[in-house]
Each structure stands twice: as structure tokens, then as C-alpha cells.
């Protein structure tokens, strides 16, 4: 029994689309690297500048999503106002001499690090299954 040509073509096209969509799936963030970045870089800075850490379990998931979407880190004007800036190579360059994690992650992809930190904040928020502090 021979399959009509259009069925073979349709199946082939479907296979290509499925394979392509799986290969191009969005980067969802690496929890381990997000945890490392937040605890070693973000917390160190918060401790120095504010005198206290800002633990992920201090806010709800929705609060962290709103914070990330607003992209407002420092409203005082004392530092860069963008949240995203603090996961960039430009920022890591400025602290690499005093922060080994920043030096280690110096050439990491900025967008992926940003996603890693977001994933860690969601994973360890107050209303998550794994609320976590800064230790």
C-alpha cells in the first residue's frame, strides 16, 4: 500500500516543525547559577550598600515578577536604576576585583544570567514550594 505524496510531505513538514520548535525553545534559567549569582553578587552588594540582605523569601512570586517587569532597581539615584544592568558584563567588570563570583561569571551571557536570577527568585519566593533566604 502506497501513501499518497501529500501525506508523506505533510508528515515530513510536521516532523521538521516539531524538531525545530524543540531546538529553539526559550531559555528558562539555571537555578544553580541563579542561586550562585544572587547569593554571591546581589546579596554582597545589598549587604554593603543597604547594610542588610534582601532574601528572595521576603517577597511573593508576583512581587518579584512586578519588580523585574518594572526594571527599577535603585530609586535613590545612587546607582544604576535598571535591574537588568546588574546582570550585565559591564557591571561584573566593575566588581570583578572584589567579587570572585563576578570574575568567574565575567563572560557569561547577560540574558541567560538575567533569566537565571529570575528563575531563582521565583523558585525561592515566599509563596513558592522552596522559600529561601540569602545564606
Could you describe each region identified by the protein language model?
Residues 1-7:
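N-terminal secretory signal peptides that target proteins for export/translocation
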Residues 11-20:
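Bacterial N-terminal signal peptides
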Residues 22-37, 52-53:
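Electrostatic cytochrome c docking/interface patches
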Residues 38-49, 117:
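The canonical Cys-X-X-Cys-His
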Residues 44-51, 69, 122:
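Detector for the c-type heme attachment site
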Residues 54-61:
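Short cysteine/histidine-rich zinc-coordinating motifs and their immediately flanking basic loops
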Residues 69-101, 105:
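Short Fe-S-cluster ligation motifs
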Residues 93-135:
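C-terminal capping alpha-helices of c-type cytochrome domains
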